[in-house]
Swiss-Prot record:
Residues 1-19 form the signal peptide. The keyword Amino-acid biosynthesis does not apply. The keyword DNA-binding does not apply. Class I viral fusion protein. Under the current model, the protein has at least 3 conformational states: pre-fusion native state, pre-hairpin intermediate state, and post-fusion hairpin state. During viral and plasma cell membrane fusion, the heptad repeat (HR) regions assume a trimer-of-hairpins structure, positioning the fusion peptide in close proximity to the C-terminal region of the ectodomain. The formation of this structure appears to drive apposition and subsequent fusion of viral and plasma cell membranes. Glycans are attached at residues 56, 73, 182, 352, 427, 433, 457. It is a single-pass type I membrane protein; Single-pass membrane protein. InterPro entries: Fusion_F0_Paramyxovir. This is Fusion glycoprotein F0. Disulfide bonds join 324-333, 348-356, 380-385, 387-410. The 2 coiled coil regions form a stable six-helix bundle. The record marks 102-103 as: Cleavage. One of its GO terms (biological process) is fusion of virus membrane with host plasma membrane. It is found in: Virion membrane; Host cell membrane.
Length: 538
């Protein structure tokens, strides 16, 4: 119980009651990998971000003329011009057309979209709808143009939160403006040119898909981070009421952006950002496990448990998370994907080994070891475990399913020729002798589709061959059957003719005998008649 209580304390930050016995499960090859907090999200609102791509330069005493800014302005104009033209083509109806397609009362230039999916048309509708907020966008534009503040908020009657970001201005404020009077114009111009050149390279790289069609290509995570610059955490905190870090929200792809306007005169880009609503279920943990083979009842086996489970209080479910977004510490889902576990699986997760089910392993390509917090958990009965420092072979007893190798046992470990450095101590305080009955091992090998298809194809080819041979045999049998039928018919007719002949002979013999008998009686009667006549005459 001591080891189990230690495991519970390890998860106390997430939940007050943890039933999964991590230590016992690790001894049978079921190793915990990651614990994540479960959160649900939905796209519910949007905000507009105004990005000023050309910074304000504080006037200097020596009136420096920064040629780098002029060149940067020219290059950036060439970069943004295709985006602005593309947006205008999509947001404006096609010229010369009397009838325009309308979505929610807004005219869209369908010809500018080309072949587009439903999602892309929806994105175009979103772009055009953003044009209706021209007053709010203009207010943000005019506000940001004359200020050196990197972030501020503007609220309209719709209570939509708009955040204006100057990605370059933050750097100008903290570095450049403090040194303007202490450096020559040439040095300042060179330093500014270097910074602007790097930023321009970054913009060109991350916005390359936007040059094709900004309405149909959402802004990538890299583009959002590039736009926001060092202001990313502040923007996320201002738009989302959550304690989750900005890095995790962006890496999960929960914030999606779309360029809706480009103002070439002011060198500003207006981006619509879809802001998700995030709700965290405080007592719900999603635990990832990694299964390796174990030595059970003198054979290599693997435990039959799901790779990911959801634990809420004292209950566990299988949790595939097929449609979720995973980060290091959180898992974001639009709905709950939990699936029920059998009672035996729950008992097994709780550390009741007698309720666990194992499947025998067939084949040599199997997961036989895993790195865990600087230690190695391996099935040393199915692979060669050799400690190189100090040098000795590692033996796994029959009553141990796997072997945990930490710094006290080995410093440099070789597993079938692969070398690992052990840097940590194992947190397992005890290891018990495992007793697993033969009835707990069942055959649940997954089907190798390619192999089975090859077998089926071979069987079909053999079947076709046998069918051809069978048809040939049937043809020969049918011919022989005709000849046999003729012979049998002849024999039957011959027998019938013999029988008829015998019957005819018998009938002829009987008829002849009967005729003779009748003739004899007739002669006898005639003799008697003659005698009677003679007697009468006498």
């Amino acid at each position: 119980m001591k080891a189990f209580s230690v495991t519970c304390l390890g998860f106390a930050v997430f939940s007050s009651s943890i039933c999964v016995n991590i230590n016992i499960l690790q001894q049978i090859g079921y190793i915990k990998q990651q614990v994540r907090q479960l959160s649900y999200y939905s796209q519910s609102s949007s905000s507009y971000i105004v990005v000023k791509l050309l910074p304000n330069i504080q006037p200097t005493d020596n009136s420096c003329e920064f040629k780098s800014v002029t060149q940067y302005n020219k290059t950036l104009s060439n970069l943004l011009l295709p985006i602005a033209e593309n947006i205008n083509n999509i947001a404006s109806p096609s010229p010369g057309s009397r009838r325009h397609k309308r979505f929610a009362g807004i005219a869209i230039g369908i010809a500018a979209l080309g072949v587009a999916t439903a999602a892309q048309v929806t994105a175009a509708v979103s772009l055009v709808q953003a044009q209706t907020n021209a007053r709010a966008i203009a207010a943000m534009k005019n506000s940001i143009q004359a200020t050196n503040r990197a972030i501020f908020e503007v609220k309209e009657g719709t209570q939509q939160l708009a955040i204006a970001v100057q990605a370059i201005q933050d750097h100008i404020n903290t570095i450049m403006n403090t040194q303007l009077n202490n450096m020559t114009c040439q040095i300042l111009d060179n330093q500014l040119a270097t910074f602007l050149g790097l930023y321009l390279t970054e913009l060109t790289t991350v916005f390359q898909p936007q040059l094709i069609n900004p309405a149909l290509s959402p802004i990538s995570i890299q583009a959002l981070r590039s736009l926001l610059g060092s202001m990313t955490p502040a923007v996320v905190q201002a738009t989302l009421s959550t304690s989750i870090s900005a890095a995790e929200i962006l890496s999960a792809g929960l914030m999606e952006g779309q360029i809706v306007s480009v103002l070439l005169d002011e060198m500003q880009m207006i981006v619509k950002v879809n802001i998700p609503t995030i709700v965290t279920q405080s007592n719900a943990l999603v635990i990832d496990f990694y299964s390796i083979s174990s030595f059970i009842n003198n054979q290599e086996s693997i435990i039959q448990l799901p790779d990911r489970i959801l634990e809420i209080g004292n209950e566990q479910w299988s949790y595939p998370a097929k449609n979720c977004k995973l980060t290091r510490h959180h898992i974001f889902c639009q709905y709950n994907e939990a699936e029920r576990l059998s009672l035996e699986s729950k008992l097994c997760l709780a550390g009741n080994i007698s309720a666990c089910v194992f499947s025998p392993i067939a084949g040599s390509y199997m997961r036989r070891f895993v790195a865990l917090d600087g230690t190695i958990v391996a099935n040393c009965r199915s692979l060669t475990c050799l400690c190189k420092s100090p040098s000795y072979p590692i033996y796994q007893p029959d009553h141990h399913a796997v072997t945990t190798i930490d710094l006290t046992a080995c410093q440099t470990l070789s597993l079938d020729g692969l070398d690992f450095s052990i840097v940590s101590l194992s947190n397992i305080t005890y290891a018990e002798n495992l007793t697993i009955s033969l009835s707990q091992t069942i055959n649940t090998q997954p089907i190798d589709i390619s192999t089975e298809l090859s077998k089926v194809n071979a069987s079909l080819q053999n079947a076709v061959k046998y069918i051809k041979e069978s048809n040939h045999q049937l043809l020969s049998v049918s011919v022989n059957s005709k000849i046999g039928a003729i012979i049998v018919t002849a024999l039957v007719l011959s027998i019938l003719s013999i029988i008829i002949s015998l019957l005819f002979c018998c009938w002829a013999y009987i008829a002849t005998k009967e005729i003779r008998r009748i003739n004899f009686k007739t002669n006898h009667i005639n003799t008697i008649s003659s005698s009677v006549d003679d007697l009468i005459r006498y």
